From Swiss-Prot:
Salivary chemokine-binding protein which binds to host chemokines CXCL1 and CXCL8. It is found in: Secreted. Keywords: Disulfide bond, Glycoprotein, Secreted, Signal. Its main location: secreted. This is Evasin P1174. GO terms for cellular component: extracellular region. It comes from Ixodes ricinus (Common tick).
Length: 104
């Protein structure tokens, strides 16, 4: 039962992350801006002293009020208007190329 509850919690948090992502991008309503949320593959817990276990890297602990457990998530906002528009040549240079094969 405890494993099922943990699985259910993770599913809810992932759904919440997706909802935040969709609401964030819809609220911006601008293709030049992007807000993304990713699950970092780890959980966090509240210690007896009230502090929370640390998440690694750029991840932050997100939890519901009153709960002693949460998920490590990374969030990122990108405003593409801060970058110049690429030229056709830059786009061509960045495009994937077919893999070259040696014939025998």
């Amino acid at each position: 039962l405890k494993t099922f509850c943990l699985f259910l919690q993770i599913a809810v948090f992932i759904a919440l992350g997706i909802q935040i992502f969709l609401c964030g991008t819809d609220a911006l309503n601008n293709e030049n801006e992007l807000f993304s949320v990713e699950y970092c593959g780890a959980n966090c817990t509240q210690q007896d002293n009230g502090s929370w276990t640390k998440c690694k890297g750029n991840c932050t602990c997100y939890h519901e009020d009153g709960k002693r457990y949460g998920l490590c998530l990374s969030t990122e906002y990108t405003d593409f208007t801060q970058f110049p528009k690429p030229t056709s040549e830059e786009i061509a240079d960045a495009s994937p190329r077919p893999k070259e094969t040696n014939s025998h």
